[in-house]
């Protein structure tokens, strides 16, 4: 059946390192075609240097580098007093220093058991202890982590399990 999609109303601005942009162009080539069909997302790519801060609509964003595995670099972001790190397995001390003074840290914690390319809960809690944010949220969790109602009470009081539709209020 033919679906008559409305024209794209909102453009998606995507900020990423050159390597990531190359993957996006390849995996979503239809979004960058000369003649797009209706309903295809309108994506505007913005190349960033992960070693330098950049600005989006007047808001400074500080890239935080880490590794997903030995050979695969990842980038998290600090925006004001919030930082978002996902797919991290390791982070250098110099990058951890970028996280001082946070109100909120969102960090991946795949499961309790060790994993080769993601922080487990113990590793995430270790990073949280080093950074000392006012609050921390665990994200990128697998089903192995257990039920929210059973697992969250085992965490330190300022550490929470994130969930879909969670909204975090940040006061500057």
Positions of predicted regions on the chain:
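Binuclear metal-dependent hydrolase catalytic cores
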Residues: 1-85, 150-172
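Binuclear metal-ion centers of metallo-dependent hydrolases, dominated by the metallo-beta-lactamase
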Residues: 51, 92-172
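Pre-active-site segment of Zn-dependent metallo-hydrolases
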Residues: 1-7, 90-98
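Thr-Gly-centered strand-to-loop micro-motif
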Residues: 63-64, 85-87, 107, 138-139
């Amino acid at each position: 059946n033919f679906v008559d999609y409305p024209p794209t109303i909102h453009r998606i601005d995507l900020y990423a390192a050159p390597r990531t942009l190359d993957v996006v162009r390849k995996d979503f080539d239809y979004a960058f075609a000369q003649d797009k069909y209706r309903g295809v997302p309108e994506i505007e790519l913005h190349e960033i240097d992960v070693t330098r801060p950049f600005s989006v609509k007047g808001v400074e964003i500080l890239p935080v580098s880490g590794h997903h595995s030995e050979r695969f670099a990842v980038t998290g972001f600090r925006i004001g007093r919030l930082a978002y790190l996902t797919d991290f397995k390791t982070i250098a001390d110099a990058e951890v220093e970028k996280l001082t003074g946070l109100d909120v840290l969102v960090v991946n914690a795949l499961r309790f058991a060790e994993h080769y390319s993601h922080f487990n809960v113990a590793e995430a809690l270790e990073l949280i202890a080093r950074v000392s944010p006012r609050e921390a949220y665990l994200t990128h969790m697998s089903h192995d982590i257990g039920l929210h109602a059973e697992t969250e009470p085992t965490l330190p009081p300022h550490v929470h399990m994130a969930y879909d539709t969670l909204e975090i209020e940040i006061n500057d």
